[in-house]
Amino acid sequence: MKKSIVTFAAVNALASTLSASHLTTAQSDLSVDEAVKKFEKAVASRNITVFDVIEHSKLADQAGLKMTDTTVVIVGSPKIGTLLMQCEPKIALELPLKFLFYKDGDKTVIAYEDIKNIAARYGAQECDAVSKLSGAQANLLKDMAK
C-alpha cells in the first residue's frame, strides 16, 4: 500500500505536458514489458479495446538493429471514437489512440498525445467526445500508478 501511494505521488509529480510535442508523459519504475501488461489490464477494466501492441525494439532486433525497449499500444472505443469521427471524419487518421512506452535510463516513460491537441488540429475541439476521450486518457495514465 505504501509503495502504491509513493508511486502514485511520483507519477503525478512527474506527469507533464511538453508544449513543443504536445505529449503528456509520466515515468514508471516498472520495466517496459511490465508497464505495458499493467496498462493492458487497466484498458480492459474500462472496456476499451487493445487493437495492437507494436514492440518496436523486438522488430528492430529482427532487422539486426538495436534500440532501447520501445512499445506502442493502440487502444480505442468504437462507441466514443465514432462520435468524434462523426463530428470530423478526417480525425479518423489519428484513431485509434496510441500510448508509447520506452526505457529512459532506469525508468519507463509512458507518453501519449492528448486528444484535445489532436482535435484542435482538425478544428474538432468542440466535439462532445473530445472531453470524454481526454479524461479517459488521463485516467489510464493514473491507473498506471495504482
Label every PLM stretch briefly:
Residues 22, 71, 108:
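Small-molecule pocket liners
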Residues 116-146:
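C-terminal partner/receptor-binding element of secreted or periplasmic proteins
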Residues 48-95, 100:
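Compact, glycine-rich, soluble single-domain proteins
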Residues 8-16:
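Bacterial N-terminal signal peptides
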Residues 98-123:
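Beta-strand/loop substructures that line and gate deep hydrophobic ligand-binding cavities in soluble
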Residues 19-50, 142-143:
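Terminal, regulation- and interaction-focused segments at domain boundaries
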Residues 35, 39, 56, 133-137:
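Stable alpha-helical elements in mature extracytoplasmic
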Residues 1-4:
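Positively charged n-region of N-terminal signal peptides that target proteins for export
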